Each structure stands twice: as structure tokens, then as C-alpha cells.
Amino acid sequence: YALRSGEQKDIAIAIGEQYQTVPQTKIGLVVALADRIDSLVGLFAAGLAPTGAKDPFGLRRAAIGVVQPLIEHNIDFDLAEAVKKSAKTQPIKVDDEVQTQILEFISGRLSVVLKDMGYKHDVVEAVLAEQSANPAASAEAVKQLSTWVKRDDWSSILPAFARCVRITRDQKQTFKVDEKLLSDKEEKDLYKALQAVSGQPSNVNEFLEIVVKLTPAINLFFDKVLVMAEDKKVKENRLGLLQKISSLSNGIADLSKLEGF
């Protein structure tokens, strides 16, 4: 019908592709994503989100239709920004709480898709805890992390990082590190090792390669240094050092979700 009405061939193809789970052309993908995100945002805002087994408007299918093509085409796409922009075009108000619900719903479908691809539950959840708003990036992170957890030396890599996280995660304050307060050799060595690999990693491989380099210094630090020192400033300085290491995983993966953490 589109061709008969005088539309260009690529436009006609895109119109047909918007109903496919994974459109093959860029125009078809753009149309499909816009349609599916608009449906999700509008219906959630209207209070018509799926409940239990009931999904009369096919929103679970729509969410899968958002994440699957982005993964298969490996397209960098910010779902949070897309939902925010779509919310502004709706005839009814879409507040921040509803937008969060939409993103959590899509994340749930993304989790299903990744597990159906054969990835382990804990690996998927570790990644989605930090970067569920970008399906293609999430899929690549899950792929990378899946390789790491199968390594022979994983049993020494994960515990080293876990020690840093466990002792700092309940701290309500982020402490700065004052090099002048570093007194023990092992804490100085750990600080120097961290400085040598300074810079926030951008993916799983970069992050865990840093942890590998830090692991010997981390283990020596915990073996020789009393983190909870009586001197408040020294204690907070040491906690700050470990917080810096723990924060390396921010935006990449929450390793506390992994088996054996």
C-alpha cells in the first residue's frame, strides 16, 4: 500500500519492518523503536502496565522488541534518555517514578533475553545492576564477564576485590585519601599501585585487568595493615583507599551479585 501510494521503497520497507521483532534496515529500526517506546511510555503513564500474567497490550513483547534489535545490531542507545524524551511528547503527565518503572520493566525483559542467550543468571544480574539502560553495552559486558568468571585465576581475582567492597559498602561517607597519612609499607604500595592504573575503566575487561594488577597489593594490604585503626584519620584514610578501588566497578558491574562473592 505504501508503494502504491507513492512512498519511496526504503520508506515502504521501514513501514513493514516496524512489526518485525528485529528490523533489518536503519529506518525500520528507528520507526520500530519509536513506536515501541511510545507505547510503553504512554500505557505505563495511563496505568495500563502488565500485571501478573495479564499483558493485554503486549508490552512485554514491545520491551523485548526494544532490547533485542539493539543487541543484534550492536547499537549504542540510551534508554533512559529515550524514555525521557518520549515522556515529553505524551498527552498525559509521565513523572519520574513512572519513567523509572518503565526502565525497570525493560531491564526485566533484557534480563530474560540475555539469559535466553545462554548467560548465567548471576552474571546477567551483576551487569544489569550497573548498566541496564544500554542493552547493547550490557550484552557486551555480560559476554566479557562470562569469560572472566571461567578463568582459572578467577578464584583469586574476585575475593581480592570483594574484600575491598565488603569493608567499605556500609560506609555512609566517602573519604579522601591523604598520601601523608599513609604510614605502613603495604598501604603505600597499594596506593602507588592504584595510582599507576589511575583512570576510571570503561568496560569489564579494563576494570578486571586493573583488579588483576592490584590483587597482590590488595592481599598484602589486608594481611599486614589494620584498616580499622584506633586513629580516626588513619582509619578513614585507609577506608578511602579501599573505596577508590571499590568504585572502579561503578557503571560496569556489581560483582556482589556474583556467586562466590
Residue ranges with predicted function:
Residues Y1-F261:
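Amphipathic alpha-helical "coupling" segments that flank catalytic cores
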